[in-house]
Amino acid sequence: MSKDVVIIRGEALADVAAKLAGEKEIFIVQDENVAHVAAAVAAALGGVKAVIGLKTSEELKTMETAVWVTERLLQADASRGALVLAIGGGITTDIAGFAASMYKRGIRYANIPTTLLAQVDAAIGGKTGVNLHGYKNMLGAFHMPEFTFLTSSVLETLPEKELRCGLAEMLKTFLIGDADAYSRAVSSGFSAKNLDGQDKNGLPSRKNAKIQDELIFRAASIKADIVCRDPLEHGERAVLNLGHTFGHAIEHCSKGEIAHGEAVGMGIILAARLSEGLGLAQKGLAACLEKDFQRVGLETACPYGIDELASAMKKDKKDGRFILLKGIGQPVITTVKEDDLRKYTE
């Protein structure tokens, strides 16, 4: 997989039409919750071959759902030259991308992510896949999208829970790749309640909209750069999993009650504590991150003990590798003994 990671910024959904000019065979795979977004895109394109609607949840992110999408493509006579256009959050882009990777041994796809988490993480980099027996992304493929189209216009009505998830992934990206952007993000007044920040009276402030857009694009660009250097995750790309070893275990233990981004936020704090305990980071890092995360409205306390987490981690595909921190902007990939894991995270 040697394709470049292409990110396009747009002021409005209609801007994507220029990128898709000349495409004769577009199939939209949409999250049914954002059908209005897909309708606007289809109108801007002057029509599409078919729209395939998905009900989205971690429980429905399965091989059966991905195969169902391929069946819809087959019924609509999609050719090898077709383009799947995924419109929705990370679950939608994961399923649509995986279906595209399987159909006729691989057809093209592109993403219009409609959640903050998908814009800064899930829709970028070509990782596609589905869950297996409740374990995250056990089946999948590396299949690079033709492009990912980013516009903050689709985030204006995003629920608070979705904003929390996206903020956690955004801060994760800055923690591994840009200390200055991390500082800017936690000091700009953003929160899970109001992505644009607040003015001195505590009211929503649109003056931060430009900063918001810049930070979203910066986070997406950091991930894109890492993926270009290591598309198949043989080395550096693994740092993007900061907080994910703990996070996936938290998700599994919660049986879906704690969303992915929320779990990653909690996982980053646990990873920081482990980093301190192993002597990789100076004392105080975890407390500093915890304060920052709480400031923007993220939950930081993991509700599960290490016994429950360790059991779930044994099924994790990262095989005992942890992404830890020497400091902000200084990730390190390492293996951790179970004794140390228990000692420093209990």
Where are each of the predicted segments found?
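C-terminal charged capping/lid subdomain of soluble metabolic enzymes
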Residues: 168-170, 280-346
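A glycine/threonine-rich phosphate-anchoring loop and its flanking beta-alpha core
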Residues: 98, 102-187
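Active-site segments that bind and position negatively charged phosphate/pyrophosphate groups
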Residues: 192-194, 208-307
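Generic secondary-structure signature for well-ordered alpha-helical cores
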Residues: 75, 144-148, 153-160, 168-180, ...
